[in-house]
Amino acid sequence: MNRVIGVTLAVCFLFLPQTVSAEEPGLITKPSKYSVTKTIKRFESAIQGKGYVIFTEIDHAAAAAKFGLQSLPRTVVVYGDPKNGPARLQQFPTLAIDAPPKALVWQDAQGAVWLTLNSAEYWANHVYKRHGTSASADFIKKLEKDLEEVSDTATK
C-alpha cells in the first residue's frame, strides 16, 4: 500500500512544475480551444485591434529543432504600445530588459493549448517599480481590461 501511495505521489510531483507555472501569481493563463498556431493568430489580431503592434514571434520549438532537439510548441509573441512605450523606455532605459510585453502560447504534455501573459497588477507592482516608474490607476485598469478581452478573444 505504501508503495502505491509513493508511486502515485511521485507521478503527481512529476507533473506539478507545469501546473504550478501555469498558476503563478502575476500571470494570466487561460486554456485555448484552438491550436497553438490559431491561438497566436487570434491573439495577434486581438492585440492589434487594441492599438498595439507585433514586433516578433519567437518559436522555441523551431529553435530547438535546429539543434536536433524536440520540444512541445512554445511561441512567444512580443508586442507593444507605440503610443506609450517609446517615451517610457526613453525615460527609464532599464525598463527595456522587461519590455516590450510578451505573450506565450504553449502546448502541454497532454496536448492542451494555453495562453500566458503577465498581469496588469504584475506590471504595476513589480516591473514598473523595479525600474523606478509607475503607472496611473486608470492606465492599469485599462491594461487589465485590454488583457482580459484580448486573452478571451484569443482562447474562446
Q: Where do the language-model regions lie?
A:
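C-terminal partner/receptor-binding element of secreted or periplasmic proteins
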Residues: 121-156
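Soluble non-cytosolic domains of exported or imported proteins
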Residues: 30-38, 55, 134-141
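Terminal, regulation- and interaction-focused segments at domain boundaries
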Residues: 22-51, 152-156
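Bacterial N-terminal signal peptides
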Residues: 6-17
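Compact, glycine-rich, soluble single-domain proteins
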Residues: 48, 59-101, 105
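Beta-strand/loop substructures that line and gate deep hydrophobic ligand-binding cavities in soluble
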Residues: 103-133
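Extracytoplasmic/secreted envelope proteins and their assembly/folding machinery
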Residues: 37-40, 44, 61, 140, ...
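N-terminal secretory signal peptides that target proteins for export/translocation
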Residues: 1-2
